[in-house]
Amino acid sequence: MKFRVDDEVIVIAGADKGHRGKILKVDRDKDKVVVEGAARVWKHVRQSQKNPQGGRLNKEMPMSASNVMLVDPSTGKPTRIGVRYLEDGSKERFAKASGESLGQIAPAKASKAAS
C-alpha cells in the first residue's frame, strides 16, 4: 500500500463518497485506512474504571484503501500514486497526474561492490 499517515485523500466509494480528509492510521496487514471525519459510527461503551461515564462515542472506523484516492498537492484533484527510483538509487512516491514528488520512501541501498 502506498498511502502514508497525514496524506490528504478523497473517498471515492461508499456512504462518505466525496469526503476529503487526512489519513489518521494505516493498517497494512488488512489493507485499511482511517480517514479523518469519514466512516463515523456510534460506539456504545459500557461503564468501567477507564470510562466511568459510559455512553456513546462517535469514532472513525477503518475503510478499505481501495475506496480512497490521494489528492494531488499541485492540482487538488484525485490521482494515483506511483513509485520511481532516483539517480542516487533511492525510491520516492509521486503523483501520476502531475508527476510531483510526494516524498522519499527508502534511502539508496549500499552497493555490494563497495564492500
UniProtKB/Swiss-Prot annotation:
Q: Which InterPro entries match?
A: KOW, Rib_uL2_dom2, Ribosomal_uL24, Ribosomal_uL24_CS, Ribosomal_uL24_KOW, Translation_prot_SH3-like_sf
Question: Which Pfam families does this UniProt record tie to the protein?
Answer: KOW, ribosomal_L24
Q: Which domain of life is it from?
A: Bacteria
CDD domains to which the protein is assigned, alphabetical: KOW_RPL26
Region feature (Disordered): 45-77, 96-115
Please give the organism: Rhodopirellula baltica (strain DSM 10527 / NCIMB 13988 / SH1)
* Protein name as catalogued: Large ribosomal subunit protein uL24
Its biological purpose is as follows: One of two assembly initiator proteins, it binds directly to the 5'-end of the 23S rRNA, where it nucleates assembly of the 50S subunit.
GO terms under cellular component: cytosolic large ribosomal subunit
Keyword rRNA-binding set for record: yes
Keywords of the record: Ribonucleoprotein, Ribosomal protein, RNA-binding, rRNA-binding
Q: Which GO terms describe its molecular function?
A: rRNA binding; structural constituent of ribosome
Which biological processes are named by the entry's GO terms? translation
Oligomeric and partner information: Part of the 50S ribosomal subunit.
The gene coding this protein: rplX
Family membership noted in the UniProt record: Belongs to the universal ribosomal protein uL24 family.
